[in-house]
Amino acid sequence: MLHGEIRWYRFGRPDKRHPVVIVTRSAAIDYLNETTIAPVTRTIRDIPTEVLLGAVDGMAEDCVVNLDHIQTVSKDKIGALITTLSEEKMKTLRQALLFALGF
């Protein structure tokens, strides 16, 4: 598991399995029991705290990373790799995360 990967995660009921982006820095992941994630959703609102993803990013359909809903979860609940975001897309994600946190 690495920073910038998109993986499957099963949220608590009634939600189902959704893709999430690993936000925790790679160097820390092996030392932690939990990791910070950002959910990926097909609900696109075109706001500064979203990062648009599509086929070029390895996703089956257009969607967004929603940085308004980051959370820290058990690594045990994180599933299979879907894709890894490019360095350029991670720069965009960083800006959206800073905006979401008020920086």
Where do the model's predicted regions map?
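Conserved functional hotspots at enzyme active or ligand-binding sites that engage polyanionic ligands
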Residues: 1-103
